[in-house]
């Protein structure tokens, strides 16, 4: 929804990030390198993914788009809205069932790069989302789902770039001290 609100102001390939996440310097360099070579009609978009265990919070569950990658491109992405530590194990709950993850899975942290061509899919995704959730008070249009639709609809590809960096962000109030320490260490 936020991307669509900004559509009229976007006149070149663009990146999307979450405001409360730290992605690391290299991730931005990677994305800049990809976007610098795109034109407005390119159908090759990009994302920077992270290793799941580098994106977890000790304070509670997180939501992550777990990625399947093939030949350097996103093949699919499944949003897991409840991933958490249970002791030393990484657990996800999908469709009411607990499943252990390795922690080595590639996940989306919503660092995407798109050409303006992506808006065609975003509009279709949004229209379907609104039509199917018109009475829901809790439904959320998720960027990973909209990005995945580009791939599943055959409207483009999403080049997958990996980041070995440790993500940090403000998922829970308890994360504040860790974030302060991480930022101070980078200054």
What are these model-predicted stretches?
Residues 1-13:
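Short phosphate-binding loop-to-helix
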Residues 4, 29, 148:
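Active-site phosphate/pyrophosphate- and oxyanion-stabilizing loops and adjacent acidic/basic residues
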Residues 6, 20, 51, 115, ...:
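Residue-level signal for inorganic ion chemistry
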Residues 12-13, 43-44, 156:
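Short coil/turn segments at beta-strand junctions that form active-site/ligand-binding loops
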Residues 12-22:
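Short beta-strand-to-loop acidic/aromatic patch adjacent to the donor-nucleotide binding site
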Residues 25-112, 116:
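Conserved core of the sugar-phosphate nucleotidyltransferase
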Residues 70, 77, 84-187:
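Conserved alpha/beta core of the MobA/IspD/sugar-nucleotide pyrophosphorylase nucleotidyltransferase superfamily
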